[in-house]
Amino acid sequence: MVNLRLQVAVVGAPTVGKTAFVQMLHSNGTTFPKNYLMTLGCDFIVKEVPVDDDNTVEMIIFDVSGQREYEPMVSSYLQNTAVFIVMYDVSNKVTFEACARWVNQVRTNSKESVGILIANKSDLSDKAEVTDRQGKDLANANKMKFYKISTLRGVGITEPIDEIARHYVDAYQKRIEQLTQMR
């Protein structure tokens, strides 16, 4: 049995749904926050993600404020981050345009981290200002995986986290095999 620990940062412009996403993960999809409270600096949760009968990944998930006034502190939250999630609101093009800045900021502070791009608020598709193609193109250009979710509806919120956990366990097992063969 393997228990691995992993640091994940969720970043993006204000009001894209980062806090709601993290809170939904924490409650296993049962509690959508009814009131919006701006994240001050950074909040975090610890989430255990079972991968199979033998492996679990404990994720320390940081919900990083998107407010500019907290930007000087953001780099300290991003250090040692193995995975980063950049989130935008499909109904707000400005939040999508901010994604490139977030990707650059994370990669400056944590060069080896794996990136995921999440298009949130898919329940607002009738008001979409960003197409799926635009999201996928941005993800591909930055070597990131792309997911489309609705935190409000609880649709797709576990897929990115489950994928991260599976990828992390697979990478760990491959590394163990490599080290074993070196003997």
UniProtKB/Swiss-Prot annotation:
SMART domains: RAB (SM00175), RAS (SM00173), RHO (SM00174). It comes from the Eukaryota. InterPro entries: P-loop_NTPase (IPR027417), RabL4_euk (IPR034112), Small_GTP-bd (IPR005225), Small_GTPase (IPR001806). Belongs to the small GTPase superfamily. Rab family. It holds the Pfam family Ras. One of its GO terms (cellular component) is cilium. GTP binds at residues 12-19, 63-67, 120-123. Small GTPase-like component of the intraflagellar transport (IFT) complex B required for both anterograde and retrograde intraflagellar transport. May be involved in cargo loading of the retrograde transport. GO terms for molecular function: GTP binding; GTPase activity. Keywords: Cell projection, Cilium, Flagellum, GTP-binding, Nucleotide-binding, Protein transport, Transport. GO terms for biological process: intraciliary anterograde transport; intraciliary retrograde transport; intraciliary transport involved in cilium assembly; protein transport; regulation of cilium assembly; small GTPase-mediated signal transduction. It is found in: Cell projection, Cilium, Flagellum. It comes from Trypanosoma brucei brucei (strain 927/4 GUTat10.1). The keyword Transmembrane does not apply. This is Intraflagellar transport protein 27 homolog. Signal peptide: none annotated. The keyword Nucleotide-binding applies. Component of the IFT complex B.
